[in-house]
Amino acid sequence: MNYFELFSFTPTYQIDTALLAERYRELQRAVHPDKFANASEQDKRIAVQRTAQVNDGFSTLKDPILRAEHMLSLNGIDLKHESTTVKDTLFLMQQMEWRESLEDISDSSDPDTAISDLHESFSDYAKQIAEELSGLLSSTNEAELIQAADLIRKLKFMAKLQIELERIEDALFE
């Protein structure tokens, strides 16, 4: 299913999340199963299915990584069940630096600054990737879409690091 069509969006990486939320509420009102309480069993099932599609679509489009994966899947590249890893040597070195920085936080004399610096580093890197990804995802060129897939893999890794950083932050400041 094309969630961009469901929400009346042109397939693009950058979307208006406020408009997405507005369209989500409109779709929810239109297909909510309660509206079909007196309908046939088949219509009730269809309403439940449509509600699930709307919920899945909203979750997918509001998350930048899932949105990017969805855009690739619309072009025949499925990343959901893959095991390919990032092969970019510079990124792998950066990854190791971030991991070391994460490990060093608890021993740091100023963990607040260390955490803040890592958040900033993650954010800066993710912004660079997002800008590049936006252009690549608008392409139908297979080589550019494969490049986009590599960038999505990097974003997925960074999301895991971000979760780990938040876990460390929570543990330190409980």
Curated annotation (Swiss-Prot):
GO terms for cellular component: iron-sulfur cluster transfer complex. CDD domains: DnaJ (cd06257). The keyword Chaperone applies. Gene3D superfamilies: DnaJ domain, HscB, C-terminal domain. GO terms for biological process: [2Fe-2S] cluster assembly; protein complex oligomerization; protein folding. Keywords: Chaperone. Residues 2-74 form the J domain. The keyword Chaperone applies. InterPro entries: DnaJ_domain, HscB, HscB_C_sf, HscB_oligo_C, J_dom_sf. GO terms for molecular function: ATPase activator activity; protein-folding chaperone binding. NCBIfam families: hscB, PRK05014.1. Co-chaperone involved in the maturation of iron-sulfur cluster-containing proteins. Seems to help targeting proteins to be folded toward HscA. Belongs to the HscB family. Interacts with HscA and stimulates its ATPase activity. This is Co-chaperone protein HscB homolog. It comes from Shewanella woodyi (strain ATCC 51908 / MS32).
